C-alpha cells in the first residue's frame, strides 16, 4: 500500500481505530520556537521576519541623496535615517554576477555566472545560469515555509532559453520563487516592456487600469506620473498585490520579496512631470556638480575625512571645454537620469507605504542596494539611441540635439556620457565593468524597525561588506541554514560572511576581510585595509599588465598608487589573488565577448544548420535573443496566409518605434516598413494581396557596405522593391512577434498590436550566410544591456 513517506499517524481497520497525521512541511517559525517538527498544528509565532530586497540597476555610490547627490530620493533617505547606511559596501562590476552572488551567498564565478547570462563558454565559471549546486535564497526560504516573490529584472537565464518554449528550469519559478512578474533580459523599455508573468509572456497593462495596491486607480483612473504606464509603477503594484494575496490568506506565513527594478539602467525614461522637475538643474556641468556632491559626501560622513576626489577618467573632458550643443545634450541626458531615479524612489516609497498599510513593515528586513557602479556604456558624449552606436552610427551632439525634447520619453533610448557616470560614482574612478571602486563600491541601506536596536537607527556602518555576504546574513536573521544537499545535489559551501553582528553595533569588526574581484580579465583583491587592482585591456598579456596598490584606510578613492613604493606588499596581494581565484573558480581568465555571441548562433542554435526558422501562430512574443537573428544578415521571410478582401494586419514585427522591421497587410496591399532609427523605408506592393490563399515574401539583401535592399513578392511575382540606406546590424533590444505587433508600433501607419485578421498559417525565415561584424556589434549591444 502506498503511504506518505513521513506518515507518523496510525492506520487501523476503520477511521475510529486510526490516528491521522498532516505533514504540512517546515515552517519558518520553527526557528523561533513557535512550531516544532513534531507538532505542526501548534500556533505559529509571529516573530519570523519578512525579507524584502530592492535592487537598483547601474546606480553609482553618490547618486542617492543620502550618499551625496542633489537628486531627490526622500524615501531611500528616510530608510537610511530609520535604519542603517552602509558606506563600504561592494558588489561585482556587472549585473548578472551581482544577482547570482546576492541570491546564493557565493561568489559569482563559483556558481557559473562570471559575466552576463547571454552565453556559456564551456567552463564552469560561465554557465549562463546559476549552477544547481548553489541553492538560491528563494529555494532555501521556500523550503523553510516562506512565500517567495520575484518582481522585475531576472537576467539569470540564458537568453536563448527565455522564449515561451523554455526550458523554464532557470526562470524564477524554477529557482525557488512562487510567483514572478517582470522581464528576463538585461534591460527593457519602461513604457513598452517585454513582460513575463510566472512562466508565460504577457502584454503590458493598459495605462488605464485598476490598481490592487491602493495607489490611485481604484476607479479605473490613469495610474502613472503623467497618466500613462510606467514599468516601475507596475512592478510595485504587482509586488504589493502578491504580498497582499499571501498575508491576507496566510498571515502566519512570512514572505521573501525580491524587487529588481529596471531603473536606473538605460534607457533612462521617466514620466514627463519628473523630467520637467529637473530642467536646467545640471547646466553647471559635471565638474561643478561632482565637486559639490563630493563636498556633500564629506559633510554627510559617507566618505572618510581626508578622501580625495579622483581625477577625471580618461576621455572625460573639462565641461568648460565642451561646445555649447554638447553641453546642452549632456545636461539633458543627466536630467533624464535624475528624473528616472527620483521616480524610482517614489515607487520605493509606495512599497514602504504598502507594507505599512498591510501591517508588515515593522517586521520586515528591507534592504535597498545597487548592482554595480554607474554605467560607462553612454560613451564620451552620451547617446540618444544606444542601438545607433551598435550599428556603427556615431551620432554627433549637433545631430542629436535636434531631438533633445525626446530625451527621457518613450521616443528615446538614452544613456548619459562618461562625465555624468563618473559624477555618479563620486569620489571614485572608473565605472561599471571595472574592478576599481567606481565599478564595485555602491550604496546599501537596511531597515528593520522591529529588529534593529532603536539606538542604532540612523547610524552608518563603515565595515567592508560584499554582496555575497547578504544571503548568509539574512539566513542568520531568520534562523535558517543553507542546506548541504538540495534536491539530491550536494551544495557548494556558502562563502559569504554574515554581518548580522554588525547590524547591532557600529564598532563590531568587519566579518569579511578578504575579497577578490574579476571582470573580463580586470582583477582586484581587498585584503583588510589594502587593495591591489589591475585594469585589463582585452587581448593584452595578463602577466605583463601592471597592478596598482592602494591603502584604502587612507585612500578610499584610489588616488595614491603605492605599487612602486611597496612592491613586496603588492606582490603579496597579487599572489593572494591567484589563491582566491583558484578557490572561487575564477579561472580561466577570459576577456572574450563578440566571439561568444557568434558561437551561440553558429554552434548551438536549436534550428537546423540551414538556419530556417518556422513559426506557426498563435505565438507569444519572442525575446530578441530567441528570435531569428536577422540583424546584419540577408534573409527571406515567407508568410503563408488565407484572407478575405477585408482582412489585414501585422504578419511579422521586430523591434520598436525607434528601430525595427514590420511586414503587414493594409488596405489590401502588402507593406514593409523598415524603420532605421525613425528613417522609414516603406514599400507598398503595386498589386493587392489576393483574397484567397497567398504566399507573401519579403527578401532583404545586405550590400557590401552599410546599405542593402528589400523586395516584396506575392505568389512568387515581384511586387515592389527599394534600397535600404542603412541595413540594420543590431535591430533592437526588443524581440519579435508573429501575427501582431508587440510593444510600441514599429510603423506609424498603424497603432497598437494591429493583429492580422485573416488566417496566418506560418511565417518562415531563411537566413542567408553570416555577415562579418555582426557578432561584434551584437556583443557590444548585449554588454550595454546587462
Summary of predicted features, one role per range:
Residues 156, 479, 582, 765-768:
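Non-catalytic alpha-helical coupling and interface elements of nucleotide-dependent molecular machines
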Residues 257, 444-446, 525, 548-550, ...:
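Short beta-strand motif preference
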Residues 588-786:
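Extracellular glycan-associated modules
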Residues 553-557, 716-717:
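Asp-box/BNR beta-propeller loop motif
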Residues 574-592:
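Charge-dense polyanion-binding interfaces
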Residues 108, 554, 768-772:
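Acidic glycine-/aspartate-rich tracts in secreted/extracellular proteins
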Residues 1-543, 547, 556-575, 589, ...:
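Formylglycine-dependent sulfatase
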Amino acid at each position: 500500500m502506498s503511504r506518505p513517506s513521513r506518515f507518523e499517524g496510525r492506520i487501523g481497520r476503520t477511521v475510529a481505530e486510526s490516528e491521522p497525521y498532516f505533514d504540512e512541511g517546515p515552517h519558518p517559525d520553527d526557528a523561533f520556537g513557535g512550531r516544532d517538527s513534531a507538532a505542526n498544528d501548534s500556533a505559529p509565532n509571529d516573530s519570523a521576519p519578512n525579507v524584502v530586497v530592492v535592487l537598483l540597476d547601474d546606480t553609482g555610490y553618490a547618486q542617492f541623496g543620502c550618499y551625496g547627490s542633489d537628486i531627490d530620493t526622500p524615501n531611500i533617505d528616510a530608510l537610511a535615517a530609520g535604519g542603517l547606511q552602509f558606506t563600504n559596501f561592494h558588489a561585482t562590476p556587472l549585473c548578472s554576477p551581482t544577482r547570482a552572488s546576492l541570491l546564493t551567498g557565493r561568489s559569482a564565478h563559483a556558481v557559473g555566472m562570471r559575466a552576463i547570462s547571454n552565453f556559456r563558454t564551456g567552463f564552469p565559471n560561465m554557465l549562463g545560469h546559476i549552477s544547481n549546486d548553489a541553492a538560491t535564497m528563494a529555494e532555501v526560504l521556500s523550503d523553510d515555509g516562506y512565500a517567495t516573490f520575484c518582481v522585475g529584472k531576472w537576467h539569470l537565464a540564458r537568453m536563448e532559453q527565455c522564449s515561451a518554449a523554455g526550458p523554464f528550469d532557470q526562470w524564477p519559478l524554477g529557482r525557488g520563487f512562487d510567483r514572478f512578474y517582470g522581464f528576463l533580459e538585461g534591460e527593457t523599455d519602461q513604457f513598452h516592456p517585454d513582460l513575463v508573468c510566472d512562466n508565460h509572456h504577457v502584454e503590458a497593462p493598459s495605462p488605464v487600469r485598476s490598481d490592487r495596491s491602493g495607489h490611485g486607480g481604484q476607479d479605473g483612473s490613469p495610474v502613472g506620473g503623467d497618466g500613462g504606464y510606467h514599468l516601475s509603477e507596475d512592478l510595485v503594484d504587482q509586488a504589493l498585490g502578491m504580498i497582499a494575496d499571501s498575508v491576507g490568506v496566510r498571515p502566519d506565513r512570512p514572505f521573501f520579496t525580491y524587487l529588481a527594478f529596471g531603473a536606473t539602467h538605460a534607457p533612462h525614461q521617466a514620466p514627463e512631470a519628473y523630467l520637467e522637475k529637473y530642467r536646467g538643474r545640471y547646466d553647471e556641468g559635471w565638474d561643478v556638480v561632482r565637486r559639490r556632491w563630493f563636498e556633500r559626501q564629506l559633510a554627510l560622513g559617507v566618505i572618510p575625512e581626508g578622501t580625495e576626489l579622483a581625477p577625471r577618467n580618461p576621455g572625460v573632458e573639462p565641461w568648460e571645454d565642451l561646445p555649447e550643443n554638447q553641453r546642452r545634450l549632456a545636461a539633458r541626458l543627466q536630467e533624464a537620469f535624475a528624473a528616472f531615479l527620483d521616480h524610482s524612489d517614489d515607487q520605493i516609497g509606495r512599497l514602504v507605504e504598502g507594507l505599512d498599510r498591510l501591517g508588515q513593515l515593522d517586521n520586515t528586513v528591507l534592504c535597498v542596494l545597487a548592482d554595480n557602479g554607474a554605467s560607462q556604456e553612454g560613451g564620451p558624449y552620451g547617446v540618444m539611441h544606444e542601438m545607433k552606436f551598435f550599428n556603427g552610427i556615431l551620432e554627433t551632439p549637433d545631430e542629436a540635439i535636434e531631438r533633445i525634447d525626446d530625451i527621457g520619453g518613450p521616443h528615446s533610448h538614452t544613456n548619459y556620457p562618461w562625465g555624468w557616470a563618473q559624477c555618479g560614482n563620486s569620489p571614485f574612478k572608473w565605472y561599471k565593468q571595472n574592478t576599481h571602486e567606481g565599478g564595485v563600491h555602491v550604496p546599501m541601506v537596511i531597515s528593520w524597525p522591529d529588529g534593529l536596536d532603536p539606538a542604532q537607527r540612523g547610524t552608518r556602518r563603515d565595515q567592508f561588506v560584499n554582496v555575497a555576504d547578504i544571503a548568509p546574513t539574512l539566513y542568520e536573521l531568520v534562523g535558517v541554514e543553507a542546506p548541504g544537499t538540495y534536491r539530491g545535489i550536494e551544495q557548494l559551501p556558502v562563502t559569504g560572511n554574515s554581518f548580522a553582528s554588525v547590524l547591532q553595533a557600529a564598532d563590531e569588526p568587519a566579518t569579511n576581510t578578504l575579497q577578490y574581484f574579476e571582470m573580463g580579465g580586470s582583477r582586484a583583491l581587498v585584503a583588510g585595509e589594502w587593495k591591489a587592482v589591475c585594469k585589463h585591456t582585452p587581448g593584452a598579456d595578463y602577466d605583463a599588465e601592471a597592478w596598482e596598490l592602494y591603502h584604502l584606510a587612507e585612500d578610499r578613492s584610489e588616488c595614491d598608487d603605492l605599487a612602486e613604493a611597496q612592491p613586496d606588499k603588492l606582490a603579496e596581494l597579487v599572489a593572494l589573488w591567484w589563491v582566491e581565484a583558484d578557490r572561487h573558480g575564477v579561472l580561466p581568465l577570459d576577456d572574450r565577448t563578440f566571439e561568444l555571441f557568434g558561437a551561440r548562433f553558429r554552434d548551438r542554435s536549436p534550428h537546423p544548420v540551414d538556419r530556417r526558422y518556422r513559426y506557426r501562430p498563435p505565438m507569444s512574443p519572442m525575446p530578441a535573443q530567441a528570435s531569428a537573428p536577422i540583424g546584419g544578415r540577408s534573409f527571406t521571410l515567407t508568410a503563408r496566409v488565407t484572407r478575405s478582401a477585408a482582412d489585414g494586419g501585422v504578419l511579422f514585427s521586430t523591434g520598436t518605434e525607434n528601430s525595427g522591421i514590420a511586414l503587414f497587410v493594409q488596405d489590401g496591399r502588402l507593406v514593409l516598413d523598415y524603420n532605421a532609427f525613425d528613417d522609414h523605408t516603406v514599400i507598398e506592393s503595386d498589386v493587392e494581396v489576393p483574397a484567397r490563399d497567398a504566399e507573401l515574401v519579403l527578401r532583404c539583401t545586405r550590400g557590401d557596405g552599410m546599405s542593402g535592399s528589400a523586395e516584396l513578392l506575392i505568389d512568387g511575382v515581384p511586387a515592389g522593391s527599394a534600397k535600404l540606406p542603412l541595413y540594420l546590424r543590431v535591430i533592437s533590444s526588443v524581440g519579435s512577434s508573429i501575427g501582431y505587433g508587440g510593444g510600441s508600433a514599429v510603423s506609424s501607419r498603424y497603432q497598437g498590436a494591429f493583429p492580422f485578421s485573416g488566417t496566418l498559417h506560418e511565417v518562415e525565415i531563411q537566413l542567408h550566410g553570416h555577415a562579418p561584424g555582426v557578432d561584434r556589434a551584437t556583443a557590444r549591444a548585449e554588454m550595454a544591456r546587462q
